[in-house]
């Protein structure tokens, strides 16, 4: 039987998936050892061109999206590797306030979201993959650690509005074994046919839309599609989606400029470059 989510009354937490800018400093040592190449080779990271030395690059075959690009998002029943972030209080779930996705990693325990989503949460959040209509078909996973870039910690840099989250194991199995995972795309072209998934605040189901991304600025992506209000922050920009699994390569998350956009019809993301790669390596090393 799939667990049903019972919300706690008056749970504290972020008032919005795209809150007003607030500086946040993750209280951990900024320095971290880099993970070895042999360990990182176990994780699939998609690059625009093969890396010379360092981390091994692996490529996936592009899979067609099927339907044509759209201008408006539509609700759907969800997909296993994308879910909602919930506040927690005294062991009970509160409301969902942002979106996250499972990303491939050697330990199978990392999520990807926007850094502004975890401002002030102090780790009191949980992830519900595939959440829809009050159900948790792939269990509830507590977030145990948060990893953000020092540039974000220091000044809330819009180009570093990215966070990796470590989740605790449930019954010994890592989350990736349960849900599958998206691949992490680094340095990919800004113009891609892209599927974006997000959980609007208070909505029983996620929304999905696909359209062409474009470069808004040298370090920011733009995605034009309606239906992405507060709560969709952290939602993945997915390309090369496999219709059989619903999984693909994530090249961005709703965030960055205007913390993802002041209008529900236009969403933004920081482009994933060397900064995101370094943050991922650090998260893998410490998770």
What label would you give each PLM region?
Residues 251, 257-287:
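C-terminal cap/linker of serine protease catalytic domains
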Residues 2-105, 278-287:
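Protease-domain processing segments flanking chymotrypsin-fold serine proteases, especially trypsin-like
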Residues 75-132, 212-217, 225, 269:
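Catalytic histidine site
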Residues 80-82, 107-109, 190-194, 219, ...:
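Loop/turn elements at helix/coil->beta-strand transitions in domains of secreted/extracellular proteins
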Residues 68-80, 87-89, 104, 125-172:
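Conserved catalytic-core segment of clan PA serine endopeptidases
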Residues 143, 158-231:
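Chymotrypsin/trypsin-fold serine protease catalytic domain
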């Amino acid at each position: 039987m799939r667990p049903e989510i019972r919300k706690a009354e008056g749970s504290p937490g972020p008032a919005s998936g795209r809150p007003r800018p607030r500086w946040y400093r993750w209280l951990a040592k900024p320095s971290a050892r880099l993970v070895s190449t042999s360990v990182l080779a176990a994780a699939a990271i998609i690059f625009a061109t093969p890396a010379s030395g360092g981390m091994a690059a692996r490529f996936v075959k592009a899979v067609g999206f099927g339907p044509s690009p759209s201008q408006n998002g539509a609700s759907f029943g969800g997909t296993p590797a994308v879910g909602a972030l919930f506040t927690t209080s005294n062991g009970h779930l509160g409301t969902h306030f942002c979106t996250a996705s499972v990303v491939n990693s050697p330990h199978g325990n990392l999520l990807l979201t926007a850094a502004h989503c975890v401002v002030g949460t102090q780790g009191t959040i949980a992830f519900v993959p595939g959440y829809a209509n009050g159900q948790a078909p792939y269990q509830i996973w507590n977030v145990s650690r948060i990893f953000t870039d020092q540039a974000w910690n220091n000044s809330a840099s819009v180009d570093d509005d990215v966070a990796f989250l470590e989740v605790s194991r449930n019954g010994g199995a890592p989350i990736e074994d349960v849900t599958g995972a998206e691949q992490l795309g680094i340095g990919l072209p800004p113009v891609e046919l892209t599927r974006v998934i997000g959980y609007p605040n208070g909505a029983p189901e996620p929304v999905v839309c696909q359209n062409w991304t474009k470069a808004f600025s040298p370090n920011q992506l733009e995605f034009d599609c309606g239906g992405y209000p507060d709560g969709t922050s952290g939602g993945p920009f997915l390309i090369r989606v496999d219709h059989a699994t619903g999984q693909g390569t994530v090249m961005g998350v709703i965030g960055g400029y205007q913390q993802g956009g002041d209008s529900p019809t236009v969403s933004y993301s920081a482009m994933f470059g060397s900064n995101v790669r370094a943050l991922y390596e650090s998260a893998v090393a410490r998770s």
